[in-house]
Regions:
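Polytopic membrane enzymes that build or remodel cell-surface glycoconjugates and lipids
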Residues: 2-683, 690-692
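Boundary/linker segments of alpha-helical solenoid repeat arrays
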Residues: 644-645, 678-679, 709-717, 742
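Alpha-solenoid repeat scaffolds
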Residues: 265, 597, 711, 728-729
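TPR/TPR-like alpha-solenoid helical repeat scaffolds
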Residues: 713-728
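Long amphipathic alpha-helical scaffold regions
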Residues: 666-674, 699-710
Length: 742
């Protein structure tokens, strides 16, 4: 080799990389930067061209909380995800994402003030001249304006998705003690292509943060018994205030404790006790969340709950109604275009939901086709109960639960038969790493002698911080009362508004905390330590993954509750937490099996590499659709050609670029797919009107006004163009007839 120094450098670098990933313990600190880097490389949007895409216009541009200076920073708890009040909400109460978005905007405001007060005027003039030369006619944007754009806001998604991947790595290493399994788990999750919508789209931050709460709740199970309920409480509360889907953590966290306690605490597993303690922590978080949401965001009841049950209803029906009234979920919109299952009878609705589930699950494994929209008639209501996809979906929803139960029983049987002597847990205290960094020595005799002491004090400080921090947080949240801006909202009738007084919530939390401290202390202090334990992690983790998949998907399935949308890929963020556990185990098993083959053992790395490369490649390609709104809707309508909404939105983006003939063609496709959709008729008429063909537009306008008589926005849009082209008077009689008819 002509350049031996280059060869030596590459060899040394390769050895360091191998040591980092195969020898160094796969802790959260070790996985932090690799997972965030991978997240950024796969999902970051193209800065020069990206703009507000899909729901981002409503979430950022149209959000009153973000754009009106009359709102204080803390007022996020009194508004829904879109910044709307309780009487105008569509049921999405997620204050944590709004706090993040507003925080970035306020950071821009403070930064702009520093610039205005400290940058010389001559520099500002020079910058303005440079900006004008590069962007003629465009005003200079301020920092707050830049912070409101989708690109800086979506950096939150990239960061927290990487954090979730790092948590996966750390938890997998804690359970398996294998670097291979740990890195496969984190990489499988971060590269899951079906999550592209949640990570690349700004609105997906709710799903990402909800997933963060779920992963933190799982990580909390590794803490000591008297700390664990407090950590679970905080984690679940974070998830719930980020997205309502985190409600699945209430049953799933105890299941995880039941399945994994013997691996996380091999000397004192106490399965049932730890599962009970985690249930207390998660249930208390759920109760506090519901009570605070009702206090801060007093919405009305859905119409189906506002009416009483029919005489003769079962006791179970009465209990369920009482629970739903107490839960007090804001009414969800029901639009046949976004969710065709709203008009389907219960049996066909379940069949359609099973079909959607089967298709989504196939995308998790083989994401060849991905889309940002699946509106009517792409996912129509089925006309028959039994067909291949409904049967497959039902089997994949019920089968994993039965398989998980069988795996759990088999794991218990193996645990009793095959035990190994306990190995001491190697700790890596943060303080030791910090001391080694300051002394510039990876091994220092005096530091290594103090490692157990440093680890003990770090653990104690962490436990005290978790217990007292959680208690302080719960108390402070419970002291925040309702807002005057919401005083006239909500149900005033007592039978529709079940509320607990704040002192009762305080008492409940205090008694629960004391009970958890007492029981947890008994477990850690009096439980007889084991000297042997089962170390096989595969069956319990696989069982948890299967249960997690089904249970976490069920709230999104449209079986129990009809959602505003029939299908969305971002809704798979929670279920993919479960599929990741199973897929990582399969990949590691495939690698190990291939490694044993005499001829092909050296190529075992191909097994996980092919799968992860395909997933990462599809994730990257799908993220390129977020370059701008035109590309997004073009790729969407190509992926789901039967979605009327995709074609119509693509036509709007074409019209914004004055490509009128193409807009007309796409509008007509949308109209053909959804002939009863008022918006498609009006938008087609508006296209013809703006093309200078107002005579042809009237037939579409008239049909659209007749099909959507209460949609003022559509009516104003049509009348405006008719007025501009001096054709409004020509149709005055017909307009008055429509007005009288409706």
């Amino acid at each position: 080799m002509r350049f031996p120094w280059l060869r030596n450098t590459l060899k040394t670098g390769w050895e360091q990389v191998k040591h980092y990933f195969s020898v160094r313990p796969a802790t959260f600190a070790a996985a932090f930067w690799p997972m965030i880097t991978l997240s950024v490389l796969l999902y970051i949007r193209y800065l020069p061209t990206t703009n507000y895409i899909f729901d981002e216009q409503e979430a950022l541009l149209g959000n009153p909380y973000l754009n009106q200076p009359t709102f204080k920073y803390g007022d996020a708890i009194y508004r829904d995800f879109w910044g709307l009040p309780a009487n105008a909400s569509i049921g999405s109460y997620r204050p944590v994402p709004n706090l993040l978005w507003r925080g970035l905007i306020e950071f821009g405001e403070r930064g702009q003030a520093l610039i205005d007060n400290n940058i010389p005027a001559a520099w500002k003039v020079s910058y303005a001249n440079l900006h004008e030369s590069m962007n003629p006619g465009r005003p200079v944007e301020t920092l707050p304006d830049l912070m409101k754009k989708s690109w800086p806001q979506h950096l939150f998604n990239l960061f927290f998705h990487g954090i979730n991947g790092a948590l996966f790595v750390a938890m997998a290493y804690r359970l398996s003690r294998r670097n291979l399994v740990a890195w496969l788990a984190g990489t499988t999750f971060v590269t899951a292509a079906i999550l592209t919508e949640a990570v690349s789209g700004v609105v997906g931050i709710a799903d990402v943060l909800g997933g963060l709460g779920a992963l933190l709740a799982l990580a909390a199970l590794s803490t000591r018994a008297y700390v664990m309920p407090f950590a679970v409480f905080s984690a679940v509360l974070l998830g719930l205030f980020s997205k309502e889907s985190a409600i699945v953590c209430v049953p799933l966290t105890p299941v995880a404790a039941l399945l994994l306690s013997h691996l996380l605490h091999p000397d004192k597993p106490a399965r049932l006790v730890r599962a009970g303690l985690s249930l207390v922590g998660a249930a208390l978080a759920f109760i506090v969340y519901v009570e605070l949401r009702k206090r801060w965001f007093p919405s009305s009841l859905p119409s189906e709950l506002a009416e009483g049950l029919e005489p003769g209803s079962s006791a179970a029906s009465h209990y369920m109604r009482e629970f739903m009234v107490w839960f007090h979920q804001a009414p969800l919109p029901k639009d046949r275009l976004n969710n065709p299952l709203v008009d389907a009878p219960p049996d066909l609705r379940v069949a359609g939901a099973c079909r959607v589930y089967a298709r989504g699950l196939s995308q998790v494994v083989f994401p060849w086709t991905l889309s940002g929209d699946y509106s009517y008639p792409q996912e129509p209501a089925p006309t028959e109960l039994i067909f291949p996809e409904s049967v497959l979906g039902w089997f994949m929803m019920v089968g994993p639960l039965g398989l998980a139960l069988g795996l759990f029983v088999l794991a218990l049987k193996r645990e009793w038969k095959h035990r190994e002597p306990l190995r001491p847990h190697v700790v890596h205290p943060f303080g030791v790493g910090l001391a080694q960094w300051f002394t510039k020595k990876s091994r220092h005799s005096q530091i290594e002698k103090q490692t157990p002491v440093i680890a003990l004090w770090e653990r104690r400080l962490f436990e005290v911080a978790v217990i007292f921090g959680t208690a302080w947080l719960a108390y402070k949240l419970n002291t925040v009362g309702p807002s005057e801006m919401n005083k006239d909202f909500g149900d005033k009738e007592l039978d529709r508004n079940i509320l607990f007084p704040s002192h009762a919530v305080n008492d409940l939390m205090a008694y629960g905390a004391c009970a958890c401290l007492f029981v947890g202390g008994l477990v850690e202090g009096l439980w007889k330590p084991r000297t042997t334990a089962a170390t096989d992690y595969r069956l319990p983790v696989a069982a948890l993954g299967l249960v997690w998949l089904v249970v976490s998907y069920f709230p999104h399935s449209n079986i129990a509750v009809l959602l505003p949308t029939v299908r969305a890929e971002r809704l798979w963020y929670f279920p993919v937490l479960g599929t990741t556990m199973v897929i990582a185990l399969l990949l590691s098993a495939g690698f190990d099996r291939a490694k044993e083959l005499r001829r092909w053992g050296s190529y075992a790395w191909i097994v996980p590499t092919v799968f992860l490369t395909f997933q990462g490649g599809r994730a990257y390609l799908q993220s390129t659709a977020y370059r701008d709104d035109l590309i997004f809707w073009r790729d969407t309508k190509n992926a789901v050609p039967n979605s009327a909404k995709a074609h119509l939105n693509y036509s709007v983006m074409l019209g914004a670029r004055s490509r009128w003939q193409e807009r007309l063609e796409e509008s007509l496709i949308a109209l053909e797919l959804a002939p009863d959709w008022a918006m498609a008729h009006v938008y087609t008429g508006d296209t013809l009107c703006r093309m200078g063909r107002p005579e042809e537009s009237w037939a579409y306008y008239k049909t659209g006004f007749d099909k959507g008589p209460n949609d003022k926005g559509l009516i104003v849009l049509g009348l405006q163009c008719l007025w501009d082209t001096k054709h409004l008077k020509l149709h005055e009689e017909e307009l008055r007839a429509l007005s009288e008819a409706h």
